[in-house]
């Protein structure tokens, strides 16, 4: 009988963990809408190089961080934008200024991209095949206390354990 009770307790504990994991997993989903599947020229190096508008649905977090990567770059993943400490907004407006600290149209801190510049730098792949650009949005449980010039690795380390929600959208660009 004692073995049965222990086994029953173990099954109940496993079931409880599975239910909790399911709740956490479903809570993490954000719907991210760029309004396009191909990056417009205005948001690329050949155009005005403006960060695109990003709509975020299902947001229930204290702050946001956004990382935009080209996963098809020849040598390694190429980061086009890192922005963090954004108040939770359903709409990130287009054309964010390329300043380290932004005060308008919203407050945020931007990091350097793989070009070595602060702020958004649009797609600029070599001519040929299209590249895929992932816009990853992280809903965090707090504003991150980081040096304004923190590296990507420092940002990712600071986000560990604080991501409540996440979502992504992918768009392509070809020259």
Task: Name each region found by the language model.
Residues 1-2:
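Context-dependent free N-terminus signature
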Residues 5, 9, 15-175:
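N-terminus-centered regions that define maturation/targeting leaders and the start
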């Amino acid at each position: 009988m004692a073995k049965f009770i222990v086994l029953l307790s173990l099954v109940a504990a496993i079931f409880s963990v599975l239910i909790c994991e399911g709740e956490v997993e479903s809570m993490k989903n954000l719907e991210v809408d760029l309004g396009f599947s191909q990056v417009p020229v205005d948001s690329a190096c050949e155009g005005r190089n403006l960060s695109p508008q990003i709509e975020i649905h299902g947001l229930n977090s204290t702050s946001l961080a956004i990382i935009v990567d080209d996963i098809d770059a020849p040598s390694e993943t190429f980061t086009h934008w890192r922005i963090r400490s954004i108040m939770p907004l359903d709409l990130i407006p287009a054309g964010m200024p390329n300043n380290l600290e932004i005060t308008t149209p919203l407050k945020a801190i931007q990091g350097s991209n793989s070009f070595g510049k602060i702020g958004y730098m649009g797609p600029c792949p070599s001519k040929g095949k299209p590249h895929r650009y992932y816009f990853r949005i992280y809903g965090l449980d707090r504003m991150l206390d980081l040096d304004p010039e923190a590296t990507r690795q420092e940002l990712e380390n600071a986000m560990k354990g604080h991501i409540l929600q996440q979502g992504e959208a992918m768009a392509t660009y070809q020259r």
